[in-house]
């Protein structure tokens, strides 16, 4: 008579390694509960817009994000906020400049606090930029998937505030004995409010500008091995960051990537026309 097969003992995963609430609430179909609809928060500063970026970004979320969600534009008003019940505007003027600090990082702390005040019962949100354009379908699985870009290269003496913050953040990670992976991929990321505010408070992010994504993910995901992004091999992003990119690669991205994004230099007429035709046809 065959003996009974013993079940393997349950493995208790420490809470610190269980991942985010969003990950724990995902089922195999990418559906999420109970924190639904998912907030998609896009900070917007009108004076830095170069064209219709925000319209394209919103159109991408509406067409391709296959989850119940609600878009929040925080910052300056844009006509796109009046185009449906699935989008809300929170007015939040840019804070005054602080000498020696990189203002977008300080300003985002201010803006995200405003969003938290408006949605106190929501556990977290997706942070996205107005220059990230979804061109193929995705769910929370792709947003939560651990990914990194090239190693942080910063310069404490740079005239560029972003480069100074990269250096300062890397030094802080080393001081705290954290990994120095660069999680800033110019792709949407999911933050849990409580954990994000712990980072804000610990590092005084309202007054000291840091690359918060790297403090956050190197703290709470320090035992993860994120995938290195590669234009040739991943299906996630095509970044347009030069004035004269290979447009054949950009055209292919509408088929083989989930997002297209751009920098200031990469906002060129060819890209603008491609996105306009993709989302709105001849309009």
Regions found by a protein language model. Name each.
Residues 13, 19-52:
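N-proximal low-complexity "stem/linker" segments adjacent to membrane-targeting elements
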Residues 60-68:
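Short, acidic, metal-binding catalytic loop of nucleotide-sugar glycosyltransferases
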Residues 165-258:
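Catalytic core and acceptor-binding pocket of nucleotide-sugar-dependent glycosyltransferases
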């Amino acid at each position: 008579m065959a003996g009974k097969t013993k079940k393997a003992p349950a493995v208790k995963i420490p809470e610190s390694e269980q991942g985010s609430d969003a990950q724990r609430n995902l089922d195999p179909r990418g559906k999420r509960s109970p924190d639904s609809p998912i907030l998609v928060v896009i900070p917007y500063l009108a004076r830095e817009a170069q064209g219709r970026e925000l319209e394209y970004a919103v159109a991408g979320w509406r067409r391709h994000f296959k989850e119940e969600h609600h878009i929040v534009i925080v910052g300056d008003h844009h006509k796109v906020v009046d185009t449906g019940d699935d989008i809300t505007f929170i007015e939040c003027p840019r804070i005054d400049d602080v000498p020696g600090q990189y203002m977008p990082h300080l300003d985002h702390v201010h803006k995200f606090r405003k969003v938290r005040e408006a949605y106190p019962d929501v556990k977290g949100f997706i942070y996205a930029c107005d220059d990230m354009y979804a061109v193929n379908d995705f769910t929370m699985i792709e947003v939560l998937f651990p990914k990194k870009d090239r190693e942080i290269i910063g310069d404490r003496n740079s005239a560029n505030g972003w480069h100074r913050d990269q250096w300062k953040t890397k030094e802080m990670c080393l001081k705290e004995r954290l990994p120095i992976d660069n999680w800033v991929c110019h792709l949407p990321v999911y933050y849990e409010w409580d954990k994000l505010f712990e980072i804000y408070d610990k590092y005084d992010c309202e007054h000291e500008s840091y690359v918060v994504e790297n403090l956050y993910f190197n703290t709470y995901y320090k035992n993860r091995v994120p995938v290195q992004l590669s234009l040739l091999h991943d299906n996630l992003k095509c970044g347009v960051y030069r004035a004269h990119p290979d447009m054949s690669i950009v055209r292919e991205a509408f088929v083989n990537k989930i997002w297209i994004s751009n920098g200031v230099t990469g906002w060129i007429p060819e890209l603008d026309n491609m996105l306009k035709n993709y989302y709105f046809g001849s309009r």
